[in-house]
A protein has these predicted regions:
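Secretory targeting and sorting signals
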Residues: 1-40
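Structural recognition of the beta-strand scaffold that forms the well-ordered cores
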Residues: 53-56, 79-83, 111-116, 162-168, ...
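Extracytoplasmic/secreted cell-surface and envelope-processing proteins
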Residues: 90-92, 122-125, 174-177, 226-230, ...
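Substrate-binding cleft of extracellular glycoside hydrolase catalytic domains
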Residues: 90-91, 102-110, 114-218, 235-242, ...
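A solvent-exposed, charged loop/short amphipathic helix patch at secondary-structure junctions
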Residues: 126-137, 180-193, 271-292, 349-350, ...
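Substrate-binding cleft of secreted/luminal carbohydrate-active enzymes
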Residues: 307, 311-458
């Protein structure tokens, strides 16, 4: 079990000038809005989110506030994505890492969330998020991407700011599920497993970015609808532990893991569980939705995966994050109770589940999704926070081929007319139409996320 007292469920404080001023007035505190944080270095804490004011990205906030209903959530903290070398210094349309860190200090924030996402041969099983570095360009990843980020994050000017890094989403799980003799294997993932550059890249990032008290690294662990099967679960945990000991890294460089990054899996399924039976038939064994998975939601998965990581050699005080940015599944189609037990197991599960995707393997711009639980510190034992690491409204990928200079291809899973592949059981993609490339603003999706938010937006 996690060391220390049982966690309390509490919204962590949000950055942003309006939020800070409101808190000051409500509490009677005297404070200077925009004053820089103290230059004294912080002592390392067990859970960086506990009691923290978390940075609100003004770039995302402005886009959200401009949408109908968006003002209600525009002051929520979201992740800052560094998905190519140019993103470190910033572009014509987005500020760079140092600008974000300086803005975090100006907001009086205690914590900023950064997504490190530019491995060589990135995302070997999804064309929509391919990156700029070739499979063999580990040296460039280290010297041109990780080293400059580390130099900025380790600047003493930011010593009193907790920096949470999400390390390389989707990378290590791909080496388990999309390689070798599996039907889902790709040549690209086989290459990355053989050359070791995912493991060594993650290890280098952990070792280089870690080692200072104010930086907290969380490794991506996929989600229950990907890793929840027995032949994926422990091997993924063991591979993460291997990466935490690779290329200069130590397990002490790992603060925890994150589940459901940029995905849509429900945090909890309130109306059915993995142990349910219908007419004497176990839903785990007889339904298309569960299909022998050991989990039906992210919270149960994350709690067990945390223990699997500890068993594999990571520190006993690691914590989990769950990305709840787009897994609310509210709106008129949300069930209000369990399905009928008079029909088939499939009918029961389909009527009970709040996750309304066609298949849990569908990941791109899902139709019907909604904003999920608002960012919250210590919601459950062993879970450091619910976070919005994926900024709601940013596309998962283009619904058709779009020329771009970011190395992002066209994945048919983002095409609403696509009928599927082995990774989603040959089901329709469930993707929204007219989507831009990954990371670009997708107004139609954001408006639907607000409309289908659960808890509802008020």
């Amino acid at each position: 079990m996690r060391s220390g007292p049982p966690p309390r469920s509490a919204r962590y404080r949000r950055g942003g000038l309006a939020a800070l001023a409101a808190m000051a007035l409500a509490s009677g505190m005297m404070m200077t809005v925009g004053a820089p944080a103290s230059s004294a270095a912080q002592a390392r804490v067990d859970n960086p989110y506990e009691g923290a004011t978390v940075y609100v990205n003004p770039d995302w906030s402005a886009k959200a506030a401009a949408e109908p209903g968006g003002e209600a959530v525009a002051n929520e903290p979201t992740g800052v994505w560094l998905d190519r070398i140019a993103a470190i210094e910033g572009t014509d349309t987005a500020r760079g890492l140092r600008e974000h860190l300086d803005e975090a200090l100006a907001q009086g924030a205690d914590l900023i969330q950064v997504v490190i996402y530019n491995l060589p041969g990135r995302d070997c099983a999804a064309l929509a998020s391919n990156g700029e570095l070739g499979p063999d360009e580990l040296d460039r990843y280290q010297s041109e991407f990780i080293d400059p980020i580390a130099e900025i994050e380790h600047d003493s000017a930011y010593a009193n700011l907790r920096i949470v890094n999400t390390i390389e989403i989707d990378s290590l799980p791909n080496l388990i599920t999309n390689t070798g003799s599996r039907e889902t294997a790709t040549p690209e993932c086989d290459t990355m497993k053989a050359n070791g550059n995912y493991v060594n890249g993650v290890g280098y990032a952990l070792g280089k970015l870690g080692g200072v008290d104010n930086v907290y690294n969380y490794i991506d662990a996929g989600h229950h609808g990907w890793i929840g099967w027995e032949d994926n679960f422990r091997p993924t945990a063991e591979l993460i532990a291997q990466a935490a000991n690779a290329n200069g890294a130590s397990p002490d460089d790992v603060a925890g893991f994150i589940a459901n990054t940029a995905n849509y899996s429900a945090t909890t399924e309130p109306y059915f569980s993995i142990d349910d039976t219908v007419n004497g038939q176990k839903i785990r064994e007889t339904t298309k939705w569960v299909d022998w998975n050991n989990y039906v939601d992210e919270l149960t998965f994350a709690k067990d995966f945390r223990q699997a990581l500890i068993n594999a050699g990571l520190p006993s005080d690691i914590g989990g994050l769950i990305d709840t940015s787009r897994n609310g599944w509210g709106g008129s189609d949300r069930p209000t109770g369990p399905g009928p037990t008079t029909g088939t197991p499939d009918e029961y599960v389909d009527a009970s589940r709040i996750d309304r995707r066609i298949n849990p393997g569908n990941w791109c711009n899902q139709d019907g999704a909604g904003l999920g639980e608002r960012p919250t510190a210590s919601p459950e034992e062993g879970i450091d926070a619910y976070v919005w690491m994926k900024p709601p409204g940013e596309s998962d990928g283009a619904s058709e081929e779009i020329d771009n200079d970011e190395g992002k291809g066209f994945d048919r899973m983002c095409d609403p007319t696509y009928e599927g592949n082995p990774r989603n059981g040959y089901n329709p993609s469930g993707a929204l139409p007219n989507a831009p490339i990954s990371g670009a603003w997708f107004s139609d999706q954001f408006q639907q996320l607000v409309q289908n938010a659960y808890p509802p937006v008020s």
